[in-house]
UniProtKB/Swiss-Prot annotation:
InterPro entries, sorted: MFS, MFS_dom, MFS_trans_sf
Cited function: Efflux pump that provides the dual role of gliotoxin export and self-protection by allowing the fungus to evade the harmful effect of its own gliotoxin production. Moreover, it also contributes to the virulence through gliotoxin secretion.
Topology class, membrane: Multi-pass membrane protein
Organism name: Aspergillus fumigatus (strain ATCC MYA-4609 / CBS 101355 / FGSC A1100 / Af293)
Up-regulation conditions: Expression is also under the control of the gipA transcription factor.
Region (Disordered): 1-30
UniProt keyword annotation of Membrane present: yes
GO cellular component: a single term: plasma membrane
Pfam family, one: MFS_1
Family recorded in the similarity comment: Belongs to the major facilitator superfamily.
Protein name: MFS gliotoxin efflux transporter gliA
Main localisation: membrane
Amino acid sequence: MSRPSIEESKQELSSSPNDSVMGKDPAPEEEMQYPSGFALSVIMAGLLAAIFLISLDTTIVSTAIPRITDEFHTVADIGWYGSAFFLTLASFQGTWGKIYRYFPLKLSFLAAVLLFEVGSLICAVAKNSVTLIVGRAIAGIGAAGISSGSYTILAFSVHPRRRAAMTGAIGASFAVAAVAGPLIGGAFTSHTTWRWCFWINLPIGGVSAGLIAIFFKAPPQARAKDVPYKEILLQMDPSGIVLLLGAILCFLLALQWGGSAKAWGNADVVGTLVGFGLLLIAFAINELWLQEKAMIPPRLFKGQTILFSSLFTFFFSGSFYLLLYYLPTYFQSVKGASASDSGVRTLPLVLGDGLFATLSGAVLGIIGYYMPLLTLGGVLTTVASGLLYTLDLDSGANAWIGYQAMAGIGIGLAIQVPMMASQAVVRVEDLSTVSAIVLFFQCMGGAIFVQAGQAAFTNKLVQEVQRHLPNISAARVTSTGATELQSEFHGHELQVILEAYVAGLKDAFIVAIVLAGIATLLSFGSGWRSVKSKKEEPKAQP
């Protein structure tokens, strides 16, 4: 997820919260009664906990996945553990934006936290892989509401003069959680159980919800818009959500089945691919028909910056999340590291991302032009992904530390720039909408391409096992957890299977290389513009 940007803070300073978020007529800032002192501190603590929670959940599971595959006896669902969360996180961004506009702000936020907690609870008690995936999907729906709701509550709680600083604090919370996630997940998995990666969400979410419930008092300007329920339903774009979810699920199922569980020419695989195409066309027609009521208002894509920023973040975030989810598998299955050790070993990637994402925001504020950061970040990530492709059974620490550091720097330089660039070229009334659009493409990239990496990994793994160990069932290998290989296989068999794992991971990293390369090319389409330029994107239709 994109961190809150400098430009977003500047935009907020120039508008009343209800103007851009709640859909009401602008009210003078002096009429707003903002909390202060202890009340404000407690509200901010609740919001920081909420954002920490969401950021933590995007990364904490990465180092736990190999151990999860041990318990559920399959490596075929690795991609779904990330994709299910990102898919619903992306698809319900616009829906929650409408919910906060038409329903009471505090109750809506608490409902989002409750939904996230229910999803986390399902994950924590899951007895099989399917239940875990369902829990991740439910948690993603709640996470979408928490992320947008947190910034809405902040806008109604903090005076514009202090809002930029508070937004920066939320960004810091996000970055800390993103770095801590793999470490915490690895520690839980090694010393207790991977289920604590989800149990931990319950007390943190409870504290956040309790603080907001007690201390946040929604001002009159935050009152829900009085609109008939039929109109509210239309504004939610339920048809768009159903069509989009159906299309992406068809595509993900085709990736999961094709080449491993079923042949690519199998009727089920072909049928899901055809269904994906038809549903995607229907979704596009639906969005064009609904216009301003659509999940993704088409008029905003008439501008070069928003179009190419969205496409860039779609491919670029896919590359990032693919590396984040599959490097722990390399460390734990191939190198024999524990879950906690693999969390430490991914620090060059996540630390580089966190540090240079902060730096890129400062640099962009100085130079103004965003294309150089997009291009440089894309080039570094492409090269680093290519270097990670060379990792083998005997690769040393110097290699994986240096390659990850380069990837982290490249990702950090560019990952939040599309959000800042898009926010800089729209008017205040479109700020929340364009933010949701960029976040949608970022999360959708994670959902689709983590699963694409899974397909590449599994297909290659099965092919290598069938080629070199014809007497061993490929299903036996894929049903063996990633960290159980050493105990399940021995001698020559183990050596061949580890080499097959490396070959599968290399194919997954090829996907990351291609995605980062496409993003680099797209960076040139964003245009040589400065975030300090006058806004020129299409104006909202009346």
